[in-house]
Amino acid sequence: MQVTETQADGLKRAFRVVVSAADLGAKADAKLAELKGQVKLNGFRPGKVPVAHLKRVYGKSVMSEVIEQTVNETNGKIVEEHGFKLALQPKVKLPEEDPQAQGLLEGGKDLAYDLEIEILPKIELGNFKDISVEKLVVEVSDAEVDETIQRIADANRPFVTREGGYAENGDRVTIDFTGYVDGEKFPGGEGQDIDVLLGSNGFIPGFEEQLLGVYAGDNRTLNVTFPEAYAAKELAGKAATFEVTVKSVAAPGPLTLDDEFAKTLGQESLEKLKEMVRARIASEHAGAARQKVKRALLDALDTTHQFAVPEGLVEQEFFGVWSRVQEDLAAQNRSFADEGTTEEEARADYRKIAERRVRLGLVLAEIGERNNIQVSEDEVTRAVVERARQFPGQEQQVWEYYRRTPEALASVRAPLFEEKVVDFLLELANVTEKTVTREELYKEEEDDEKAA
């Protein structure tokens, strides 16, 4: 076997590999000898089939198997001998021209192929004790707890029928409706016994406003225009009319925030309800603060660990990111111009994001490997169970899906590993707490999540 390195450019390597026909033939003969005692052919006793006859019958298929095995073994040796860590699966270019390929399968030609690989960079880790980050802290105020409980109360408030009354803002109007665009009904444009909470802005602009003043038994024609960014593209920006029949009008009834109200929500008292709400708000704030400090930590790692990353990994990450961007724009019926940019500029920006993600992923993986940070099978199982609970009635199907799909299981393990490495780094870094308001905590949160 001859191996010649033909490229050593950055993280890319290429090799020309030649395996003699004699070596391939010897391997093929050995496999045919194994087959001799296994195959049954008419006219021959078991185990007595001549190897020459086996070669005529099975020669090409055996040689094909030998070539595949030889390529895999040779590639493995090259990677091992050079101490490479592969970024992606190797690319193998085998002979494609028919005479050459036939000659290989018939055992009369040397195997000559090209191997292209992309390797992971060697990463020099910085001193994590030099990293300084702020951890934002928000104290949950009584006012925030009271506001949250009031929202819960409003969502659970009873409604009382307005006998002969006219609908006001805040009332619940129950309607049947049929919608028309250009005089024709459209999919999803009909509904029966639909509750509309006036003033909630739960329907397209102008719909709720035109229901003010209606009464039970009333019939109205509503004229509206679908938003330009409406999810259903065929309706976006179009004028529509809705023929509406009012079934009932109900006003919000009285509701007292007391122990009895708390019991309707599964709490033994109003005080216990407040404790539960405070804990939930505190948990939400802690999650947001975690994202902020994680973003700051990743920014610091990105600044202190600049190195070339495998183009193939960047392309994979960019493809995933870009696909989601296009899907989101399509779902909202928006364009890059609507976002104040061009497709070219957006591509450049998201490619930078993809490169950052790949680089940080490699850094975190290196930190985890050097410090023996691992995710246990129990932790993965608990995470899968948690995901399965999000699909009531389908838990078993979800569990089986993850059990049968290694890629899906890896998607569960990866974030668990990342959070463990982040915890490890935060133990080493200089973390100072800073008390801020709720508004300051959630400022630019979406940008933080996208960049992280």
Curated annotation (Swiss-Prot):
- In what residue span(s) does the PPIase FKBP-type domain sit? 170-255
Query: What InterPro entries does its record include?
Result: PPIase_dom_sf, PPIase_FKBP_dom, Trig_fac, Trigger_fac_C, Trigger_fac_C_sf, Trigger_fac_ribosome-bd_bac, Trigger_fac_ribosome-bd_sf, Trigger_fact/SurA_dom_sf
Q: Which GO terms describe its cellular component?
A: cytoplasm
Which superkingdom? Bacteria
Compartments it resides in: Cytoplasm
The disulfide bonds in this chain are: none
Q: Which GO biological process annotations does it have?
A: 'de novo' cotranslational protein folding; cell division; chaperone-mediated protein folding; protein transport; protein unfolding
Pfam families xrefs: FKBP_C (PF00254), Trigger_C (PF05698), Trigger_N (PF05697)
Q: Which GO terms describe its molecular function?
A: peptidyl-prolyl cis-trans isomerase activity; protein folding chaperone; ribosome binding
Q: What is its EC number?
A: 5.2.1.8
What the entry lists under SUPFAM superfamilies is as follows: FKBP-like, Triger factor/SurA peptide-binding domain-like, Trigger factor ribosome-binding domain
Per its record, the protein catalyses:
[protein]-peptidylproline (omega=180) = [protein]-peptidylproline (omega=0)
Q: Does the keyword Membrane apply?
A: no
Q: Cite the entry's keywords alphabetically.
A: Cell cycle, Cell division, Chaperone, Cytoplasm, Isomerase, Rotamase
Q: What does this protein do?
A: Involved in protein export. Acts as a chaperone by maintaining the newly synthesized protein in an open conformation. Functions as a peptidyl-prolyl cis-trans isomerase.
Q: Give the family, as the similarity comment puts it.
A: Belongs to the FKBP-type PPIase family. Tig subfamily.
UniProt remark on domains: Consists of 3 domains; the N-terminus binds the ribosome, the middle domain has PPIase activity, while the C-terminus has intrinsic chaperone activity on its own.
In Swiss-Prot or TrEMBL terms, this protein is called Trigger factor
**What organism is recorded for this protein?**
Xanthobacter autotrophicus (strain ATCC BAA-1158 / Py2)
Tell me the lineage of the source organism: Bacteria, Pseudomonadati, Pseudomonadota, Alphaproteobacteria, Hyphomicrobiales
